[in-house]
Amino acid sequence: MKIPVTVAPASRRKKLPGRRRYVLLLSFILCMVASSYAREAYKYKRIGGDLDAQAMADTGLAMMGGGTDLDEAFKWLCGKGHGGDFLIVRAHGSDDYNKYVNKICQMNSVATLIVPTRKAADEPRVAQIIRKATVIFIAGGDQSNYIKFWKGTLMGRALNDHVVAGKPIGGTSAGLAVLGQFVYGCMEDKANDPDLTSKEVMENPYNPRVTLLREFLQVPLLVNILTDSHFAKRDRMGRSLGFLARIVADGWSKDPREIAIDEKSALLVEADGRAKVVGPGQGVYFLQVTEPPEVCKPGQPLTFKNVSVYKAPAGARFDIRSWNGEGGEPYSLSVEAGEIHSSRTGGAVY
């Protein structure tokens, strides 16, 4: 049976006022934009198991100097996670690490979390993903983005909780730069700026681009320590000496230390602070301040003497707690009026 339907003549149909139609259309568009933005605020790409593993992790710290990724370092870091869930975090970029880590490690899952804004870093789901990870690796990129986007957010707190819980963590390049208590933040660098050079810093330790910060993360073994990467490859010794001088001159520490790692090198640190150096790069440089800088003032060349250095090549061992090593070479460096002088034969800095 057909049910008759009465349709009002066109002349009797009510039309929405033009202003109301405009408001409804605008509201619809804004809702769609907001929904799209919420979906794109962060990206999470995962391979492997859909359910999180209940793996017990061992404390470990994988500090990588950038350049070619080292299978040995990643396998060591994965081993600390005992088959749990491996999470890569970054502000921009791709999920290329997923396939790489999944190929060389036996993990329940490997995922990449890309968090490009503070709004995204304050999403509860982002913090939840981090809290469920067994192992976290901070990828390379631009450390100023990590600081601007993540510090003081739900994500930042979740990262620190991961460290406090004793779970394994690692980082390379910019990801290494934010592991120490003291951080060179690149906060004043523009997109196309070249690297801040050793010459620039030694000529003026208060160069506006020397932006130092504290406690992005609170890794217990890295208290009072500055971390840097691409070290010998990019000739960063002079700028590191300038950074350490600034830390003293600004009253942050009387005797700061630095762990500086060259490209294709890594430092694998156990829970008790004992570490080994791996990789074909020039290794790891452990710096320690022994006396305050004589001259560390705005617009003046740096004078800073007797900074102790321990160069640790692949195979060397170093105890971060006692600050002693074996298998490496100790020497000292001084800066006088912006020029480096080394105690090594031939005056070699690296």
Residue ranges and their predicted role:
Residues 10-12, 19-20:
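Short, low-complexity intrinsically disordered segments enriched in A/P/G/S/L with frequent Arg
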Residues 24-33:
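Bacterial N-terminal signal peptides
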Residues 34-38:
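Sec/Tat signal peptide C-region and signal peptidase I cleavage site
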Residues 39-83, 189-350:
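C-terminal and late-domain segments of enzyme folds
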Residues 87-92:
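Short internal beta-strands
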Residues 129, 152-166:
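Catalytic-core regions built around general acid/base machinery
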Residues 139-140, 163-183:
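Catalytic nucleophile loop
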Residues 143-153:
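Glycine/threonine-rich flexible loop motifs
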